[in-house]
Swiss-Prot record:
Protein name (Swiss-Prot/TrEMBL): 6-hydroxynicotinate 3-monooxygenase
Reaction(s) catalysed (UniProt annotation): 6-hydroxynicotinate + NADH + O2 + 2 H(+) = 2,5-dihydroxypyridine + CO2 + NAD(+) + H2O
Active site: H47, Y215
Activity profile over pH: Optimum pH is 7.6 with 6-hydroxynicotinic acid as substrate. Stable between pH 6.0 and 9.0.
Subunit: Monomer.
One annotated GO molecular function: FAD binding
Residues that bind FAD: G15, E34, Q35, H47, R108, L130, D294, A307, A308
Lineage: Bacteria, Pseudomonadati, Pseudomonadota, Gammaproteobacteria, Pseudomonadales
Organism of this sequence: Pseudomonas fluorescens
Signal peptide: 1-20
PANTHER family found in the cross-reference section: GERANYLGERANYL DIPHOSPHATE REDUCTASE, MONOOXYGENASE
Temperature-activity note from the record: Optimum temperature is 35 degrees Celsius with 6-hydroxynicotinic acid as substrate.
Cofactor note: Binds 1 FAD molecule per subunit.
Length: 385
């Protein structure tokens, strides 16, 4: 193992943790560098579709997540005012039969904990905030805020929308404000009935310019989560995360259905944050550096597939490194990008447009995807200058 190329994963988020575990399973020499001092239960709700559950099966945490999460029978889309059903997408047993795994909603922190717990303590290095990375041709040197340096043969950057690895590849560039704020809250399921409707296990309420997505985040259905998309023309990107309030929510969703009002009334704490995007990048790798997840294709959360794309990226990158060998990393990176860029860009575009499942449509291209069995596409050969 000591002679194996040293693979550094910078960031132990969902995509980074999944990539690290899958690489370890393939026998690679992996070290994970995480800026947080320790693991903590962060985030709120998250969708985990069959396309991701098939990866978690390989990792070995599918059953545990199935036990933790809520399993909606349908994704409902409803009219903001009347509550009329705009779309009813079958999930539940249908998803298992048609797509090969379940569809669930769960607390992001609980999901993340399962992924991190799947990694040996010996590969984790906490308190490592990357300040600089140097690809010296034969080795990569990473500099951290604690004054330490580390070397690796390959550096994977699942380090988010403000990725240091992306900055090294393409230079500094601020992400674009998408023109929307999102509010989110997690709270105990209200005891009261909500207007004329019960609380659907998974529902998105739509108007012409804004929405609210709500679902349970536990198998017991004792915690509810909502996340919104509300247009705000200008925003100071220095204020990424802020406290919000019931009053602000009532103003943003004035006149909406009684069920939505009941959710706002039951809110304990609510925060808001700005939604950021980037245009598709001209490259995902160079030399010994490679990106995945939000580092190369950040997207609005309106398709509930952002984390899924990062985890799929990690799985495909591990597959490509196994396919051609880590010593041939540039070919592996080209193969990885050739097999991920089109799908990630499609999800990024649909997320931007915020049209996903607003009407009845076939989601099989998304949910039925199996990263381990999809035929690999060869990278395009660049024309000679």
């Amino acid at each position: 193992m000591s002679q194996s190329p040293r693979i550094a994963v910078v960031g132990a988020g969902l995509g980074g943790a999944a990539a690290a575990k899958l690489l370890l399973q393939e026998g690679f020499n992996v070290r994970v560098y995480e800026q947080a001092p320790s693991f903590s239960r962060l985030g709120a709700g998250i969708h985990v579709g069959p396309n991701v559950m098939k990866i978690l099966r390989r990792i070995g945490i599918e059953d545990a997540l199935n036990e933790q999460g809520s399993h909606p029978d349908y994704w409902y889309s409803r009219h903001w005012q009347t509550g009329d059903v705009l779309a009813q997408i079958p999930l539940g047993d249908y998803a298992v039969k048609e797509y090969g795994a379940s569809y669930l909603t769960v607390h992001r922190g609980d999901f993340h904990a399962l992924l991190v717990e799947a990694l040996p303590d010996s590969v984790m290095a906490y308190g490592k905030f990357l300040t600089k990375v140097e690809d010296r041709g034969n080795v990569v040197v990473m500099h951290f805020a604690d004054g330490t340096t580390e070397e690796a043969d390959i550096v994977i950057g699942p380090d988010g929308v403000n990725s240091r690895i992306r900055e090294e590849l393409l230079g500094p560039e601020l992400p674009k404000y998408a023109g929307y704020l999102a509010h989110r809250a997690v709270f105990p399921t209200p005891e009261v009935k909500a207007g004329m409707l019960p609380f659907d296990a998974c529902v998105k309420w739509w108007s012409d310019d804004r929405h609210m997505m709500t679902y349970f985040v536990t198998g017991k259905a004792d915690e509810l989560y909502y996340v919104t998309g509300v247009p705000v023309e200008k925003w100071d990107l220095n204020d990424r995360w802020l406290e919000s309030s019931k009053e602000e929510m009532r103003e943003a969703f004035s006149g909406w259905h009684p069920t939505v009002q009941a959710l706002i009334d039951a809110t304990v704490e609510v925060t808001k944050w700005s939604l950021l995007e980037r245009d598709p990048l001209p490259l995902w790798s160079r030399g010994r550096l490679v990106l995945l997840g939000d580092a190369c294709h950040p997207m609005k959360p309106h398709m509930a597939q952002g984390a899924a794309m990062a985890i799929e990226d990690g799985a495909m990158l591990a597959r490509c490194l196994k396919e051609v060998g880590a010593h041939n990393h540039e070919l592996a990176f080209a193969l990885y990008e050739a097999n991920r860029a089109e799908r990630a860009s499609k999800v990024q575009r649909i997320s931007h447009d915020n049209t996903w499942l607003r009407t009845n449509e076939d989601p099989s291209w998304c949910f039925g995807y199996d990263v381990f069995n999809v035929p690999l596409v060869e990278p395009k050969v660049k024309a000679a200058a």
